[in-house]
Each structure stands twice: as C-alpha cells, then as structure tokens.
Curated annotation (Swiss-Prot):
It comes from Myxococcus xanthus (strain DK1622). This is DNA mismatch repair protein MutS. Belongs to the DNA mismatch repair MutS family. The gene is mutS. The keyword DNA damage applies. Pfam families: MutS_I (PF01624), MutS_II (PF05188), MutS_III (PF05192), MutS_IV (PF05190), MutS_V (PF00488). SUPFAM superfamilies: DNA repair protein MutS, domain I, DNA repair protein MutS, domain II, DNA repair protein MutS, domain III, P-loop containing nucleoside triphosphate hydrolases. GO terms for biological process: mismatch repair. Keywords: ATP-binding, DNA damage, DNA repair, DNA-binding, Nucleotide-binding. It comes from the Bacteria. One of its GO terms (cellular component) is cytosol. ATP binds at G631, P632, N633, M634, A635, G636, K637, S638.
Length: 893
C-alpha cells in the first residue's frame, strides 16, 4: 500500500494502522518513527528505506490478505539509529504516545513531538561535538540573495544579504551548513543547483512554506519572537531578503521542534567586509578545515592547531580559521592574549585542566530550552557552571585585556550553579518518569513521598514473607502489573494450599493470581505515593528547567567566554610546542616571512626529517609585488606558496605563525588557484574550472588581496597556456596590484621581470650530484633553467626503459633536428623482435619520412627557414616570438 491510499483502503485498516496513516499524511517527507510500547515502528515505504540504511530486519504485518512491510528499533537505542538516517540527509518524525494506556476508550493518542532533520539536531549522540550544525535558509530575487544561518542546538542566529551567488556561497561555506531551506517548489530551481555546485560539502535540501519567506510576514514573526517594535537593532530594516530568510528559518525550528525556541534570544546581521574573505575553493585548496585526501580533520590546518579541551573551543577555533579577522585592534588583542598564555606554562596547564571539566554549555542550554533535555543535562550543566569561578581565578591574573574581559560573563551564574548543585541527584536517570532525579534534602514533601514509597515496598516484602510462612508455599511471590496492580502468584502445583481468604483474579498457564484485602490496602498506599512522587519530581524538574531558560542569555555569554578562552589557549599551546613566533600585522601591503614553514607539512614529517624553511618578501612599495616561481614539479613550489597563504591566514586569525619572523600587511581576501578535482565530478573540464576560478580572482581581487596561482594555463595547448598565463600575470601587475605568488612551468614568464618593475623571479634550488638530482626545497632568486621532468618521472618509479627512452627523445627534440617538413624528428628504435624493413634512422614526429631524393624543402619552406634564421632572439620577447611563429605557420599552410 502506498501513502496515497484511498479512503476505502484506509477504512479497512485496524484502528492503530489508521492512526499511523493519519499521522503519516501530515509528514509525507519524513520517516515516521511510530511509538508502540518499547519500540519505534516503521511501515510501508518508510520500513523498506529504513531497513536498507540501518541494516535491520524487514518483516511484515498482516492487512487482510496483504502484508504490510514493517521494521522497528528499541526506543532506548533510537538516537543511534536516528543519527544514521539523518546523516543520509533524511528527516525523521518522532510520534510518541501522549497518554497512558487505559486512560480512555479507544487506542492511545499519539502525536509527532518533534521532527529531526540534518539541520535540526539536538541529541548529543547525533551531533558532532567539535562541529557546528547549521541550517541555512535562502531566498532570492533578481536583485540578490538573502540567507539566515541558525544553529538549533546552540541558538546562534545570523542573517545576511549578498549581491550574487558567488558571494552567498562564500558566506555559507564558512559554516558548512548541513541543511538548506528553500521556499516550496524551489528545491529543483536552477539557482539552488548553482548554489549547491559551489559548496564543497553538499547540504540536504528541504522546502519551507513559501509564505514564511515573505519579508513583511517574516519581519512580523521576528518582531513577535524577540518582543521588539522594529528590526533595526538587528540591522535588518533595510534587508528584506535577509529578514525573509531569518523568519523562515525560525519558523522551521519552531515547527519541527514543537517549541517556542526561547534559547534563540539574539539575531545578528553578518557583514561581508569585516573579515578576511576566502571562497570555498580557496579554503578547500589550502586545507584549512579538512584534508583534501579524505575530508577529515587530520592533515588540515585545523587538525594541527586544535589543542582545545572543550567542544565549545573546538567549534570556536574552526570558526576563527574559516573566517579570520579583518580588524587590526581585534587581531592585536588576540595576539596579546596568545603571547601572555604562551609564556606561562603553569597557567596554561592549570587552565586546560579546569576547562576539561566544562561541558558543552551551549548545547546543554539549547536542549533544555527546547524541552528535549533531561535530568542528566541539568546535572552536567550544574557541574560545568561550578567550574567557572576557577576559570575566573586564573584569568584574573592575566594582563591581556581580552582575557580579562572574559571574567565578567563567567562570573554571572553563581546562583544557578548553586541551585543545580543542591537540586539534582548525582546520577539521575535518563527518562523523567523513572524517578530519582532530585537530590534528597532539596524538597521536604518529595522526601516524605520517597520515604513512604520505600517503606510501602518494604511492607509488601513483609506481606510476601508472612504469606509464605502462613501457607507453606515457598515459591509464592508478590508481583505487579498495570492491569491488576499487586497480586500473589501461586503455581498450580500448590493450589491446594491456598487459604480461603485469597481472591482469585487471573489464571495463567502455570499459575493462579490472587489478591487479599490487606494487599489491596497497601497497594493503594504504595501506588499513591509513587504517583505523587513521580508527578512532584517532574514538576520540580520543569521548575529547574524554567530557571535555565530564564538564564539562557547569561549561559550563552558564559559559553562564548569559555569558547574564546579555550581557542586562545589552543593557539598559545601550539605557539609554545611548535616554536611559532608572533607576527607583526599592520595596515601596509607588505608581506615578509623569514624562515617560514608549512604548519601542516612540518607536523607530518617522519622522525629525523626536518622542514626546509624559506624566506618570502612581497612589498609593492619596494618593487616586489608579483613573484614568478619556477622549478621542477616535485621541488616544493606549491608547498611554499600554500605556507605563505596559511601564514597570513593564521596571523589574521590571531595565532602565532611558523616562522622566525613575519610581517603581514592586512589582507582583505586570499585567493588560490591550484587544482580542479572537486569540480571535475560536476561535469566541468580541468581547463574550464581553471579559467572560471581565474576569472573570479581577476574580477574580485584588490590591491589588499593575496593571490596564489599554481600552473595557470596547464590545461590547454602550450602556446595558448603560455599566452593566458602571461596576460594574467600582466593584469595582476598592471591593473589589480595585488600581492601574488605565480608558480609556472612556462619558463618564458621569467622575462616578465625585465618588462615589469614589480615582478621578481624565484626558483627552487636543485643540486645535481653523481648523475642524480637532489631537490633542495629552497627558494633562491632567479628563474629555473630546466624542469627536470624526467628526473621526477624516475623518482616516481617509472620503469628504467621508459625513463631511458624519454632521455633519448628529449635529447633529440632539444637538438632541434627537423625533418623535411620542418618538424622535430624523433629517434626510432628497433622494436623487440624487430619488424622487417624497419628504418634505423630518424623518423618525423608524425611518422613522415623524407621524400626519395632531393632535400624535400619547398621554396615557401626555405623562405620561412631564412626568416627564422634572421630573427634576433635576444631582442625578442616571448610574445614577439609567438607572433613570429604564428606568422610562419600561416605562410607554410
């Protein structure tokens, strides 16, 4: 049966299955977890899909002559299964029993209590502790884009507007959203496809009610939620697209979580100009957050610099690296803090030891505010808040203004910490109905009910023992179920010993069940106490939760302070352990690095290996704006260029850097163009990707930008590639004025330094010794004389006969030997087991042999040869040479 079954088919179902179909109809885009006793069950297509993903057994339930596919998972283990489904980009609707069985006629009432989506995750077991989990809502028109970023588990909420899709993708890529919310009917819109193509990590796509994106309605919804008269405080009065996206995101949170979302207590507008900008491609190429190898943290800059001890700090550090600062005062404030902590090893270790005891304040507060938390969350929150005064005691010793500023938010919650410490049991249960959440001595009435419940159970045990002695039935047991309450169970072999005052209630296969007036009296006493105790505990829990909700803004501020302190501590620990130095960051356009190292590569070297440091100086004011770097492919050009970009990024994030000294003139953007693997799978050729990214750089770079270009033009023919590379370099020098490192295999580009005053040549030094080539990985002034491609091929393990043949062909080509058509000859070898009549001389590159007799040179060819001989090579630029060559080609055609 499919979910569009007709009314007649639905009417033929059992009442429970009809209830399932009614609920499912309200959530057609979600897998429905339907609570039946101790299991969540799934039916029909949901069951088939879930069983495949979760690798659980698919069974069937009878429906007349048909079988309904079904599967299920235990409710106590559901979070793990839900996490796997959500990680596949699916939504899961949780349908719970909202009343106790037997409280009324008919089946138990059930409702969806929340919908879990990739961007709406609250459970600790499903969330990745060190990563944020953002929903991105987007709207657009012919004037631009609006977006809102909402982290449901922490309450973080931002909105922005962007003039185009490239700028929007750049902003979204900083937080790597897990889910994209678009208006109804827009999931397959070309704009959405274009946006997804620009994001390295593709989010799941969901649709929200189109009306919720409408700016006027969304603005009213936001004003109501935040209880304000206007959105001017959030900077959204003049940003209708951003306001529309923000309203839709907030509505999606409330609709899926069935809550008021009180922890979302602030909204900020994200401005593009305040930070160092990087597009998604540049961030990926530099491996800032994850490795290109496997997408993991290991092998990335974040993996090296993350020495945080809290989840809060880990997420903050990732955010700092994804979006470095653009403000000199803020950069210097972080550097001051890192400098102080890096020089205080005792303070560092003391602070790290305390912070390890602090839980995820943001997400604990978020779960409790959304009604998804339990007593264990209260306990964890209380223990974490109790550590904050110890953190304050360490930070109060510091001189850094930034570190001192953290003490205020960390000192604002002593009453809540004390309350939770007194109120919550040391080891509370997972569920609210199990009892034992509240600490003894916190509430007098609860203590009385607990004592009464405990003593009542003792009385029941006494009754059991007394009845055993009175009847002589040693196997007699006092048991309980929800239908009969407490009863005496007697095996059938002992029925002849049952006293006459026993009242029979039920017969089973092996026993009879009885009650007595005394047992019913004590049952009422015990059950009444249990019910009252349970109800009072839940009431007290809700009162404590309300205290947390009211303190949510202060908890969020404390969490921000913990995260900032932990991220600064991580920078300081790296500086001390790795030998980093404080960079000088100023408003100039200089970039000078002395003995710089690649922060990731140096950490991955084997024992006994050491990284070769390099000096780089870019300063347009001193005729050093664009560096053309030549040298063999394995010599380390790409490593040097990447380390320069990473050094600038680290400095503006507030970190010390891997260098003996560094001066970084503030960068507004970092661009890289180094590879096309990510886009090849999307149907673009290597060369098209290369040109698209280069175009983006040339259109958006400024004289404050830092540009890394690696092998521009390699994806096309030699002459086309050289021409494009030359023109790009000229444009960067003459028009853009940006600081740039330009690695190339076109050695002709070294001549740019003779034509352009701010171009300098660097090459990677190579040493030839005993017929072997040693790559020294050291930058030296000047251009490379050759590429050493065959030596690289040898190092890569090509068979010796292939390497030897390549040397022979190279010598032949480099000697300039031409056939009768003026094309280079290639030496021909006798194939193994040679063919009869094979030539042992020279064969043209295209397989042509000279004509029999004569020179084979036509008058036109001779004229071209004479023109070539008469050319003054020393006075020609590469472009002049290319023009001459093109002219000669036309004459020969």
């Amino acid at each position: 049966m499919n979910e569009g079954a007709g009314a007649r088919e639905i009417a033929s179902l059992t009442p429970m299955m009809r209830q399932y179909m009614e609920v499912k109809a309200l959530h057609p885009d979600s897998l429905l977890f339907f609570r039946l006793g101790d299991f969540y069950e799934m039916f029909f297509e949901d069951a088939v899909k879930a069983s495949e993903i979760l690798q659980i057994t698919l069974t069937a339930r009878s429906k007349g002559a048909d079988k309904v596919p079904m599967c299920g998972v235990p409710y106590h283990a559901a979070r793990r299964y839900i996490g796997r489904l959500v990680s596949e980009g699916l939504k899961v609707a949780i349908c719970e029993q909202v009343e106790e069985p037997g409280n009324g006629p008919g089946i138990v009432r059930r409702e969806v209590t929340r919908v879990i989506t990739p961007g709406m995750v609250l459970d600790e077991e499903v969330l990745e502790p060190q990563a944020s989990n953002f929903l991105a809502a987007v709207s657009w028109n012919d004037k631009g884009w609006g977006a809102a970023l909402l982290e449901a588990s922490t309450g973080e909420f931002m909105a922005l507007e962007a003039p185009g899709i490239a700028e929007l993708a750049e902003s979204l890529s900083r937080v790597e959203p897990r889910e994209l919310l678009v208006p109804d009917g827009k999931r397959d819109a070309p704009e959405v496809a274009q946006l997804l193509a620009r994001l390295v990590r593709t989010p799941a796509v969901a649709e929200g009610e189109a009306a919720s994106f409408e700016p006027t309605r969304a603005a009213g919804y936001l004003r109501s939620h935040f209880a304000v008269q206007s959105l001017s405080a959030f900077g959204l009065d003049d940003a209708p697209l951003a306001a529309g996206a923000a309203g839709a995101a907030l509505r999606y949170l409330k609709d899926t979580q069935k809550t008021a979302a009180a922890h979302v207590d602030r909204l900020s507008r994200q401005e593009r100009g305040g930070n160092l900008l990087m597009d998604e491609s540049s961030r990926a190429n530099l491996e800032v957050l994850r490795s290109l190898r496997d997408g993991g943290r290991k092998g990335s800059l974040l993996g090296v610099l993350d020495k945080t001890v809290t989840s809060l700090g880990a997420r903050k550090l990732a955010r700092w690296l994804a979006s470095p600062l653009g403000s000199l005062p803020e950069i210097h404030a972080r550097l001051d803090a890192v400098e102080e902590l890096s020089g205080r090893s005792v303070w560092r270790e003391e602070l790290a030891g305390i912070l390890k005891e602090v839980g995820d304040l943001e997400r604990l507060c978020g779960r409790l505010s959304l009604g998804a938390g339990n007593a264990r969350d209260l306990r964890a929150l209380g223990l974490s808040l109790a550590q904050l005064p110890r953190v304050v005691a360490v930070l109060a010793r510091c001189e850094s203004p930034l570190l001192k500023s953290l003490t205020g938010p960390l000192s604002a919650l002593p009453e809540l910490a004390e309350l939770l410490s007194r109120a919550v049991a040391e080891e509370p249960p997972v569920t609210l109905k199990d009892g034992g959440m509240i600490r003894a001595g916190f509430h007098a009435e609860l203590d009385k009910l607990v004592a009464l419940s405990t003593s009542g159970k003792d009385l029941l045990l006494q009754i059991e023992q007394r009845e055993k002695e009175r009847t002589g039935i040693s196997s007699l047991k006092v048991r309980y179920n929800k239908v009969f309450g407490y009863y005496l169970e007697v095996t059938k072999s002992n029925l002849d010993r049952v006293p006459k005052d026993y009242i029979r209630k039920q017969t089973t296969v092996n026993s009879e069940r009885f009650v007595t007036p005394e047992l019913k009296e004590y049952e009422e006493q015990v059950l009444t106490a249990e019910e009252r105790r349970c109800a009072l505990e839940i009431q007290l829990f809700e009162e404590l939760r309300a205290q947390v909700v009211s303190a949510a803004p202060r908890i969020r501020s404390a969490a921000e302070a913990v995260a900032t302190g932990d991220a600064l501590l991580s920078f300081a620990r790296c500086a001390a352990e790795y030998g980093y130095t404080r960079p000088e960051v100023d408003a100039s356009v200089a970039l000078s690095i002395t003995a710089g190292r690649h922060p990731v590569v140096e950490r991955m070297l084997g024992a006994g290996d050491s990284f070769v440091p390099n000096d780089v100086r870019l300063d347009p004011a001193e005729d050093a704006q664009l560096m053309v770097i030549t040298g063999p492919n394995m010599a380390g050009k790409s490593t040097v260029m990447r380390q320069v970009a990473l050094t600038a990024l680290m400095a503006q994030a507030g970190s010390f850097v891997p260098a003996k000294a560094a001066r970084i003139g503030l960068c507004d953007r970092i661009f890289t163009r180094v590879g096309a693997a990510d886009n090849l799978a999307r149907g673009q050729s290597t060369f098209m990707v290369e040109m698209t990214e280069t175009s983006h750089i040339l259109h958006h770079a400024t004289n404050k930008s830092l540009i890394i270009l690696d092998e521009i033009g390699r994806g096309t023919s030699t002459f086309d590639g050289l021409s494009i590379a030359w023109a790009v370099a000229e444009h960067l020098h003459d028009t853009v004025g940006a600081r740039a490192l330009f690695a190339t295999h076109y050695h002709e580009l070294v001549d740019l330094a003779r034509e352009r005053p701010r171009v300098k040549n660097l090459c990677v030094a190579v040493k030839e010794q005993n017929g072997k080539v040693i790559f020294l990985r050291k930058l030296v002034p000047g251009g490379a004389s050759r590429s050493y491609g065959i030596e690289v091929a040898k190092l890569a393990g090509l068979p010796p006969e292939v390497v030897g043949r390549a040397r022979e062909l190279l010598q032949n080509l480099e000697s300039g030997e031409l056939d009768d058509a003026g094309r280079p000859r290639v030496a021909v070898r006798q194939p193994q087991g040679g063919r009869r009549g094979a030539s042992t001389g020279q064969l043209g590159l295209f397989g042509m042999e000279p004509a029999q007799g004569g020179t084979g040179v036509t008058p036109a060819q001779q004229k071209a040869l004479d023109a070539l001989k008469g050319a003054s090579i020393d006075r020609m630029t590469p472009l002049d040479a290319l023009n001459l060559l093109a002219k000669l080609q036309r004459e020969l055609e």
